[in-house]
Design a protein with these regions (language model features):
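Acidic, metal-coordinating catalytic segment for phosphate/diphosphate chemistry
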Residues: 7-53
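Hydrophobic residues on conserved beta-strands that form the core of alpha/beta folds
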Residues: 4, 18-20, 32, 68, ...
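Nudix hydrolase/Nudix homology domain
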Residues: 2, 7, 78, 115, ...
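Short loop segments at secondary-structure junctions
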Residues: 26-27, 48-52, 71, 136-140, ...
Length: 188
C-alpha cells in the first residue's frame, strides 16, 4: 500500500494549494510527488425540456442543451463548455454550487435536477473532481458574471447531437463537457 509520510504546502492561492507529498511505495521506496489540492468543481449539462421524461426514447437531435464560451489562460484560447464552476464556498452542497453557476454563467434556473456522477479532472496533477449534474424545467434570469473571462462569455444553444458531433470533430475538447454529454446521452 502506498503511504504519505509527510506533506508540505509549497504555495497557497485562492482556493488551491500546491502540495509536495513525500510517499512510500509498497516495497518501501521513498519518492516525492507534487500536486494541486483543490476543493473540486461542478458542471451542469442543460436539458432544454420541461422534465427528464422528455429524454426517454427521444432523438438527441431534438433535445436542446446550452454551452458557454470561456477564455482559458492555460490554453490561450476560448473554449466551449457546459456551465461550471469551482466549489469555492466552504460547506456549500455541490448541487447548490451547480445552481449558482448555472444562473451566473447561463442566466438560467432549473426546476428539476439529477446527479449524473463525478469525474477526476487530471489525477496525475490534482485531486480535483467535477461533480456533474443535469437539469431541466428552465427559466431565464439575469446573468451575474464575475471576472473578465465571464464578462466576455457567450451562450450557445444547440442540440445534444450537435454538441456530441462538435466533441467528435475536436471543436469541443473540455473533458467535463464531453463526459457530461455522454452521460446525458445514456439517459435517452
Amino acid at each position: 500500500m502506498f503511504r504519505s509520510r509527510r506533506r508540505r504546502n509549497v504555495h497557497e492561492w485562492a482556493v488551491w494549494t500546491l502540495v509536495e507529498d513525500h510517499l512510500e511505495s509498497p516495497t518501501g521506496e521513498e519518492f516525492v510527488r507534487t500536486y494541486v489540492d483543490s476543493p473540486g468543481a461542478v458542471g451542469v449539462v442543460v436539458v432544454d425540456a420541461e422534465s427528464f421524461d422528455a429524454l426517454v426514447g427521444n432523438d438527441l437531435g431534438r433535445i436542446g442543451t446550452v454551452l458557454v464560451s470561456q477564455y482559458r489562460a492555460p490554453f490561450g484560447e476560448v473554449m466551449w463548455e457546459i456551465p461550471a464552476g469551482m466549489r469555492d464556498v466552504v460547506d456549500e452542497p455541490a448541487e447548490l454550487t451547480a445552481r449558482r453557476e448555472l444562473a451566473e454563467e447561463a442566466g438560467l434556473v432549473a426546476e428539476h435536477w439529477r446527479y449524473l456522477g463525478v469525474m477526476a479532472s487530471a489525477p496525475g496533477i490534482t485531486n480535483s473532481t467535477v461533480e456533474i449534474f443535469a437539469c431541466c424545467g428552465l427559466r431565464e434570469v439575469e446573468v451575474e458574471r464575475h471576472g473578465p473571462e465571464e464578462d466576455h462569455m457567450e451562450i450557445r444553444r444547440l442540440s445534444v447531437a450537435e454538441a456530441l458531433e462538435e466533441c467528435r470533430r475536436g471543436h469541443i475538447t473540455d473533458s467535463k463537457t464531453i463526459i457530461a454529454l455522454q452521460w446525458l446521452a445514456e439517459l435517452v
